[in-house]
Amino acid sequence: MTKRAFCILLTLLTVSMCLRAQGYFCDREGAQLEYVRKNVKDGSVVWRFTGTVTKVADSGSYKDITTESEFTKPNGKPLYSSSVLQMVRVNNETQEVSVDVAGAMASYIKARAGLKADCGSVFSSLPADAQPGDVLPSVFAQAKVGPLTYDLKITDRKILRHETLVVPAGTFECVVLEEHKVESGPGHNRDVINHTWYSKGVGYVRHDSYIKGKLDTSEILNSITK
């Protein structure tokens, strides 16, 4: 083997090791990811939001990551009364990502309606070594707001394929996850099929929602500040 060939092989192996050492989430404290969601029918903007990694606490076995998202209307004014918090745990050995879905529900309800919700903690997982055909565990969460109960069911979670995706923020190697998401409760019911593109070290890059088989909204990563 020539010296040049050896260097190329070493580089490829290093890149491969780095990829395996990353999960499908951004763990760089201070990083900001800006997303834009649009209605597919007419191209109008539904919202924009910037997610900021505000805290990364490393215990040795895992990292606990806190993100804070600020949503704005198309005119730039705040969409909610406060930011939406999300807690994520990344296993340092396997790099599996676990998102506290129930906690995010509680924060969303507080931001949108100013109400306190009792949700507990329910996690949605995405392994770092996920491959096309893999089926992931379903997620069931519930929020109690006074006498009212809101349910969230995320089922039929499966990895569809690998795909290289180009968005305004750049070009990303992704896995595509399909999920059936049902939200139900007084005054709020939504039944969608979601396709989400995840890239290692970043998180999701694109998020499409289908209603009755028809693409309804598409959300893309517009920029990322590291």
Could you describe each region identified by the protein language model?
Residues 1-5:
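Positively charged n-region of N-terminal signal peptides that target proteins for export
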Residues 22-86, 90-91, 140-226:
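Acidic, serine/threonine-rich low-complexity disordered tracts
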Residues 6-10:
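Sec-dependent N-terminal signal peptides
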Residues 33, 101-168:
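Secreted/surface-exposed cysteine- and glycine-rich disulfide frameworks
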Residues 14-18:
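N-terminal signal peptide c-region/cleavage motif recognized by signal peptidases
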Residues 61-134:
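Contiguous hydrophobic, core-forming segments of folded domains
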